[in-house]
Amino acid sequence: MNDNFKKQPHHLIYEELLQQGITLGITTRGDGLSDYPKNAFNMARYIDDRPYNITQHQLQLAEEIAFDRKNWVFPIQTHENKVACITKDDIGTNIDTLTDALHGIDAMYTYDSNVLLTMCYADCVPVYFYSTKHHFIALAHAGWRGTYTEIVKEVLKHVNFDLKDLHVVIGPSTSSSYEINDDIKNKFETLPIDSANYIETRGRDRHGIDLKKANAALLNYYGVPKENIYTTAYATSEHLELFFSYRLEKGQTGRMLAFIGQQ
């Protein structure tokens, strides 16, 4: 696949940004220690897995991306649209063990160096933000709830520079095979973007939704230039050899870790 995300042993990396001091990527599912499912490279401490496995996977990833895990930050995601400002004082949060810190946070941003923002995914959309000019990075977790409540708009509220200097990467997530019902479709039709561009009716109370397209449209609507938005072709629901899919695997699966940091 011709994509800006390039395969590595346990992750995909947005390779062209490395020379700009940006480490941006997402883990893949295979060649791990977890039994959930077998040989999974699960990165979530909050599912049925041994803590030892997660720690070993963290250490493996830290070595592969050359970003010490002591500098990682992980929030407790709740499918909302709250955004947290992260500083070096937050490094290590929820990495060795889960705590009450950063609870209810589904997006983070920082202007600090040597901080790796991380969150878990298994169909929801990882949205990465960066500006090398202004030394800004952010990461958002956008499932259908986060997309509908415009979590990308909430992140943009914390950008204190011209949006023409901001770049956004929309990472691997479910494809338009993801379906919603009438009630959820009606919610999306209240957004300030044309739902016909990302929702397709397939039958009674059945509508396919492309959450990647929806988030890209919202970003553009709120001022991010189209040419500054990159959307990967990788999809969790179409590439099960690489990714976990909560919906296709009926919840019995692991989680990938999306990450972004700057040197």
UniProtKB/Swiss-Prot annotation:
Reactions catalysed according to its record: adenosine + phosphate = alpha-D-ribose 1-phosphate + adenine; S-methyl-5'-thioadenosine + phosphate = 5-(methylsulfanyl)-alpha-D-ribose 1-phosphate + adenine; inosine + phosphate = alpha-D-ribose 1-phosphate + hypoxanthine; adenosine + H2O + H(+) = inosine + NH4(+)
Gene Ontology molecular-function annotations: adenosine deaminase activity; copper ion binding; oxidoreductase activity; S-methyl-5-thioadenosine phosphorylase activity
Binding site for Zn(2+): 79, 124, 141
Cofactor names: Cu(2+); Zn(2+)
Keywords: Copper, Hydrolase, Metal-binding, Oxidoreductase, Transferase, Zinc
InterPro entries recorded: Cu_polyphenol_OxRdtase, Cu_polyphenol_OxRdtase_sf, Cytotoxic_necrot_fac-like_cat
SUPFAM superfamilies: CNF1/YfiH-like putative cysteine hydrolases
CDD domains for the chain: YfiH (cd16833)
TM helices/strands, residue ranges: none
EC code(s) of this entry: 2.4.2.1, 3.5.4.4, 2.4.2.28
Family classification: Belongs to the purine nucleoside phosphorylase YfiH/LACC1 family.
Functional summary from the UniProt entry: Purine nucleoside enzyme that catalyzes the phosphorolysis of adenosine and inosine nucleosides, yielding D-ribose 1-phosphate and the respective free bases, adenine and hypoxanthine. Also catalyzes the phosphorolysis of S-methyl-5'-thioadenosine into adenine and S-methyl-5-thio-alpha-D-ribose 1-phosphate. Also has adenosine deaminase activity.
Subunit (UniProt): Homodimer.
Identification of the protein by name: Purine nucleoside phosphorylase SAS1121
Species assigned in the record: Staphylococcus aureus (strain MSSA476)
